[in-house]
Amino acid sequence: MSVSVFNRCWSKVILETLVRQGVSHLCIAPGSRSTPLTLEAVRLQNAGAVTCHTHFDERGLGFFALGIAKATQSPVAIIVTSGTATANLYPAIIEARQTGVNLFVLTADRPPELWECGANQAILQQNMFGQYPVANVNLPKPNADYSAQWLISLLEQAVFQQKQQGGVVHINVPFAEPLYDATDEEVNSHSWLQPLQRWLIQNKSWINVEAQQNEVLMHENWDHWRTKRGVVVVGQLPAEQAMGINSWASAMGWVLLTDIQSGVVPTTPYEDIWLANQTVREKLLQADIVIQFGARFISKRINQFLQAFKGEFWLVEQSGKALDPYHHSLTRFNAKVHHWLRAHPPLRQKPWLLEPLALSKFCATFIEQQVGGNLTEASLALRLPTLLPYNGVLFLGNSLLVRLVDALTQLPESYPVYTNRGASGIDGLLATAAGIGIGSNKPVVAVIGDTSTLYDLNSFALFKNVTQPTLIFVINNNGGAIFDMLPVDEQVKDQFYRLPHNGDFSQIAAMFDLKYAHPYTWADLNSVVKQAYSRRKATLIEIKTNPSDGSSLYKRLIEQISHAVIGA
């Protein structure tokens, strides 16, 4: 039996199994040991079953796959060769695990006889990602003693675990040489595949698992709790689950606190700012019940409120993950928000607390005055909705600007917002944005800090394949301006936290053949944006600001509002 032919047969069964589980995008890094998987991926692409994407940097490739999976809400498979190539996927695997994004990570490996004996590019890859995958599938070296049916069943068992929890399945696949001298005809006619012939021509899984019924029942005490004073807090949600929350909370007369990732239009905008007001915060803590939809709040003030609240606490979130960092004694509903709302009709009543609305209106005027008309981080955050395309998507990086956007921006209802807030790292943000663009096939606005951009420069190469207008805003405040929020000596802060780079991104754009603009005023920016939307390619828009402008304004707004006296 030819080793190279059987390697391909083994790989064929693996990828055919994943395709039947919803994989339509394969992200591939170049490498020799992964050749059997790569050649089967090419065969599937030629058959129209999948789309293959390539990238030379495995760390970026992992986040690119993450972005596609976020946008398509379908699992994505990654194929890499053996050695440290595999380790570069770790950050994306962590982010996927934290947020329940489904990835299949296929790591080619040296065969066991080459482990721990000084062989080249052979590292310990079994279970190498620790507890972050929902399942680790450590396959043996391809061997006809194992039936193809066994291989499918083993993989589908891991898929079942993924569907229950959401996250990453790591499949480690050792291959012995030779890797190259197999033809499609030899693979397709191999006797080992004969029991699968009917399965191979059908688009159905090997094991049929009936969908779990997730009917949401009204809480037995809902008629009691809906008469009480409540606060609705909305965190990160899929866009389709945002509809109806605002009107439901308004009908109840309850206070609504929203995160920028929620897709919900706030009734009392600028929550991150006005929650700094101690008088209003103390009154808000007198609520009888808090109902939280979604999780992972950006706002420090909302998090502080959740931590301080000691009353009845309900959490509605579909993943089943533990998402209460403040460890309330709570009632948990594993449900989609719109299903839960349908089962819990509102009781129409007047607002029980008027101060948030009054303070929100005051904030609107005060913030406009403080931000002014210059092109700055804060003004970009405040007026970001005017730059967004209809039927587009927004990606926010993890920098000072995401906090400013959360504090100042009011987006249209259900406007898709993507972030990497599972681990909130600054790695892979460009790659994720590129993946979201490819996966959604919609115009994309990505807003990313300069340090984050420097950390992921290789991923600019991924934007050459976008087919929709893509605007990459790089906020260049000369380093990590978010660290201005820390109570650290200025000299120490510059040397060990902010790390000024004193550079710009014009040459980077040229290197990756991207359109580039550096607007100085809002008039310049509006012209640049108009041109960018006329092109079905990526434009890098660099916004240069003074290092401390954004953080100083943010701190000033919070300080001023914290002492404001507003009559309801």
From Swiss-Prot:
EC top class named in words: transferase
Signal peptide bounds: none
Swiss-Prot/TrEMBL catalytic activity: isochorismate + 2-oxoglutarate + H(+) = 5-enolpyruvoyl-6-hydroxy-2-succinyl-cyclohex-3-ene-1-carboxylate + CO2
Cofactor note: Binds 1 thiamine pyrophosphate per subunit.
Cross-referenced InterPro entries: MenaQ_synth_MenD (IPR004433), MenD_middle (IPR032264), THDP-binding (IPR029061), Thiamin_PyroP_enz_TPP-bd_dom (IPR012001), TPP_enzyme_TPP-bd (IPR011766)
Domain of life: Bacteria
A GO biological-process term: menaquinone biosynthetic process
EC number per UniProt: 2.2.1.9
Residues in coiled coil: none
Pfam families in UniProt: TPP_enzyme_C (PF02775), TPP_enzyme_M_2 (PF16582), TPP_enzyme_N (PF02776)
Record pathway: Quinol/quinone metabolism; 1,4-dihydroxy-2-naphthoate biosynthesis; 1,4-dihydroxy-2-naphthoate from chorismate: step 2/7; Quinol/quinone metabolism; menaquinone biosynthesis
Cofactor(s) of this protein: Mg(2+); Mn(2+); thiamine diphosphate
GO molecular function terms listed in the Swiss-Prot or TrEMBL record: 2-succinyl-5-enolpyruvyl-6-hydroxy-3-cyclohexene-1-carboxylic-acid synthase activity; magnesium ion binding; manganese ion binding; thiamine pyrophosphate binding
Keywords: Magnesium, Manganese, Menaquinone biosynthesis, Metal-binding, Thiamine pyrophosphate, Transferase
Family designation: Belongs to the TPP enzyme family. MenD subfamily.
Described purpose of this protein according to its UniProt entry: Catalyzes the thiamine diphosphate-dependent decarboxylation of 2-oxoglutarate and the subsequent addition of the resulting succinic semialdehyde-thiamine pyrophosphate anion to isochorismate to yield 2-succinyl-5-enolpyruvyl-6-hydroxy-3-cyclohexene-1-carboxylate (SEPHCHC).
Subunit structure, as described in the record: Homodimer.
HAMAP family in UniProt: MenD
Protein's UniProt name: 2-succinyl-5-enolpyruvyl-6-hydroxy-3-cyclohexene-1-carboxylate synthase
Gene name tied to this protein: menD
